[in-house]
């Protein structure tokens, strides 16, 4: 199902930053869900916010469990275009 969202790219991009920051370091299902959603919707991020996410993920003190770290590193690669 496709949905329409009221707002502009900057609004959506900022909300995705909030989701990333909420999930970073947690040890729950939300990590995988967040990483997959952001990774599959990179077109919704501004270039500035991609840079913010890269900085957040690279500077994380704790990624959570090993499976969470793998999710974050996979998202980081996507954000960097690797």
Regions found by a protein language model. Give the residues of each.
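Short terminal alpha-helical segments
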Residues: 1-31, 35
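Short linear motifs centered on Gly/Pro in flexible linkers and helix caps
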Residues: 7, 36-37, 52, 61-64
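Short amphipathic alpha-helical heptad-repeat segments
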Residues: 7-15, 45-57
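Charged, low-complexity interaction regions
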Residues: 21-29, 42-50, 62-70
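Amphipathic alpha-helical segments within well-ordered protein domains
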Residues: 35-42, 58
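Amphipathic alpha-helical binding modules
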Residues: 56-82
